[in-house]
Amino acid sequence: NNGVAQGGIISTPEGKWYGLLFRDNGSVGRIPYLTQVTWTNNWPMMTAPATLDIPANTIGISGIVTSDDFNYSAPVKLHTAWQWNHNPQNSYWSMTARPGYFRSTTSRVDTDIKLARNTLTQRTYGSTCSGVVSLDVANMKDGDYAGLSMFQDKYGFVGVKMVGTTKSIVMVNASSGSMVEVASAPLNQNTVYFRID
C-alpha cells in the first residue's frame, strides 16, 4: 500500500485503461503511480506489474523545475515550471515593466506567506534540492517582504523586510504556526542573493 491513496482511472484513445494514483511523500510532495486497469464484472481492477508497455512520449514534456532569467519575448507567458500559490492578481506582476526581471508589487500587506498574493513557486525536486534567487529590493515599501522560502504547511524563509525606510535581511521560522524572526541584519544595498538548500 505505502500510502497510495488519491487518484482516478483514465482511458486512452486506444481503449486502454490505467489508474493514476498519488502517494504523499513529505517535502517531495505527491509521487504519481501508474497502474494497469482491467475490468472484471464491470468493475475496475488495478494491477501493478513490474513494467508497463507504454510508448515513449513523442510530443515532449516541459520540466517541472527550471532556471529562469525572465527574458521572455511577447506574448509573455511564464514557463510551465512556475506555479502561483493563489490565483494571480495579474495587475500586480509584470515581466515587461523591466525586461529580464519578474516584478511583483504589493496589492495588500499580509501577516503570513500562505495568505500573500502573487507568490511565485516551483516544486521541490527529490528529497533534497537547492534554490537561488537574485532580488532587486530598491522599490520596496513599508511592510513589504521579498525573499526565498520553502513551504508546505510549516515553513521558513530568508528575505528582506522593509520597516519605514529601513531594510533588513531576516530569517524567519514559522514551523510553530506563527512567524518568528530568528535572525536579522541591516541591509544597505539594493541587490541581494538568497540560497536555500
Regions found by a protein language model. Give the residues of each.
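Carbohydrate-active catalytic/glycan-binding domains of CAZyme proteins
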Residues: 1-197
